[in-house]
Each structure stands twice: as C-alpha cells, then as structure tokens.
C-alpha cells in the first residue's frame, strides 16, 4: 500500500492521537464492560503512555498521508522479573497501542505499523514482541495472527456474585 509515511510522533499530533484513542476506547466498550468512556480517560492515558515510552526505550509512530492522520502504533521495552521465565521472555518488546482509521482498515496499514514498531524495537536487543487484545476483538486478533503473532497467555475472567 503506497501513499503514506510512518514517522515519529510530534506534539502537534496530540489531538489526532487522543481522538484515535477515544475511538478505540469506545469500540472496546462495545466488547467489554470494563472500559470507561474514552473522552473521560484518554487524555490522562496518553500522558501516561508518553511517560512510559520515554522511560522504556519506546516510540509512538504516526501513519499519515499528505498530512492526514491514518493511524498510530506505540511500543515499549518491557522488563519483568518472573523467575520462572527465560531472560528473553522477561525483557521483550510490547506494543501498547495500535489504531488505524476506519477507511484504511484491511488495507495493510496495520501490518506496516506493526513492522515499524518491530523495526524500532529490534535495535534494543529484544527477541520477542507481545501485544494484548480483548478476546472479543476478532478483527484485531486476525490482524495480529496474520502478522505472525501467536497466542502466548490467555487470561480468563469470572464475575463473582455479590456476597454479604
């Protein structure tokens, strides 16, 4: 897919990124009841994301075409201290966010953003990249599997009845 560039985030992208994060949050609210209204939380969420990116060898990358915002991907290097896991599992790349505008979904842009995140993470020395997805988000799961991601851990949830 031609006609777009992927470049580092600039502060002038903030409004478009927050709007994208709100759109993503509102979509995820249709998939699971744990998601709060996007407009209420995404400004603070993005502030925290920027801090994590700065502290953890990360990047926020923007896809655009002629100045039109098309999407974003954010990634960090995450370090865990799980004594039962290998070193390359404990220090891994993590894609925190990915978003593509609705009229470009299915065009290959998500794949290009994922590659760009991998290109950013590779020089850090990580050999694994992870991404989380809501179980009900079949479209995202297909995109990640198409890109070569495989299920790693599966988390189950059960609601408990209120007890007195």
Regions found by a protein language model. Give the residues of each.
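Conserved acetyl-CoA pyrophosphate-binding loop and the N-cap/start of the following alpha-helix
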Residues: 104, 108-116
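Conserved acetyl-CoA binding element of GNAT-fold acetyltransferases
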Residues: 86-102, 154-157
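Conserved N-terminal entry element of GNAT/NAT acetyltransferase domains
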Residues: 1-15, 164
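A short helix-loop-beta-strand connector motif used in the catalytic cores of GNAT acetyltransferases and
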Residues: 46-61, 94
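Conserved beta-strand in the GNAT
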Residues: 62, 68-77, 94, 99
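Conserved GNAT-fold acetyl-CoA-binding loop/helix
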Residues: 25-48
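Conserved active-site alpha-helix within GNAT-family acetyltransferase domains
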Residues: 111, 123, 135-153, 158
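Conserved GNAT acetyl-CoA-binding A-motif
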Residues: 121-132
């Amino acid at each position: 897919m031609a006609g777009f560039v992927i470049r580092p985030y600039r502060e002038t992208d903030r409004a478009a990124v927050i709007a994208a994060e709100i759109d993503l949050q509102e979509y995820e609210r249709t998939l699971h009841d744990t998601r709060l209204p996007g407009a209420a939380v995404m400004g603070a969420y993005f502030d925290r994301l920027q801090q994590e990116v700065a502290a953890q060898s990360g990047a926020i990358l923007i896809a655009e075409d002629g100045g039109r915002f098309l999407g974003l991907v954010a990634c960090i290097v995450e370090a865990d201290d799980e004594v039962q896991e290998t070193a390359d599992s404990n220090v891994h790349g993590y894609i925190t966010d990915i978003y593509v505008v609705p009229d470009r979904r299915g065009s290959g842009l998500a794949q290009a953003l994922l590659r760009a995140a991998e290109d950013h993470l590779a020089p850090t020395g990580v050999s694994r990249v992870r991404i989380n997805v809501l179980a009900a988000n079949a479209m995202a799961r297909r995109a990640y599997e198409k890109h070569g991601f495989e299920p790693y851990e599966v988390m189950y949830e059960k609601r408990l009845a209120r007890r007195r």
